[in-house]
Amino acid sequence: MKKNTHPEYRQVLFVDSSTGYKFVCGSTYQTDKTEVFEGQEYPVCYVSVSSSSHPFFTGSKKLVDAEGRVDKFLKRYSGVKQMAPKPETSVEEVLPKGKKKAPAKKKK
């Protein structure tokens, strides 16, 4: 078997950035940031939503996402000007060179 194929499994400190709630859980998350929690130093991972802030677990109907998809879309494309509609042009059938169009069949 190959050696060193699996990532290192260790205790990682997860911090909910919206509530400040901290918890330790086993993970393979890789980071250089560390933080002291309950007297021990752990690698730290900042999360935007956890069980302490998600509406399903808290029972509240507060808006968790500070900037949603629609807001991001409007922010990105608010300065874009609308394009003028293109005028319709007639479409001609293009045949390869040397080929002639078959004559139309007569209806009976």
From Swiss-Prot:
PROSITE patterns: RIBOSOMAL_L31. GO terms for biological process: translation. It comes from the Bacteria. The keyword Ribosomal protein applies. One of its GO terms (cellular component) is ribonucleoprotein complex. Residues 85-108 are annotated as: Disordered. SUPFAM superfamilies: L28p-like. Residues 97-108 have a biased composition (Basic residues). Pfam families: Ribosomal_L31. Keywords: Ribonucleoprotein, Ribosomal protein. InterPro entries: Ribosomal_bL28/bL31-like_sf, Ribosomal_bL31, Ribosomal_bL31_B, Ribosomal_bL31_sf. GO terms for molecular function: structural constituent of ribosome. Part of the 50S ribosomal subunit. PANTHER family: 50S RIBOSOMAL PROTEIN L31, CHLOROPLASTIC, LARGE RIBOSOMAL SUBUNIT PROTEIN BL31C. Belongs to the bacterial ribosomal protein bL31 family. Type B subfamily. This is Large ribosomal subunit protein bL31B. The lineage of its organism: Bacteria, Pseudomonadati, Chlamydiota, Chlamydiia, Chlamydiales.
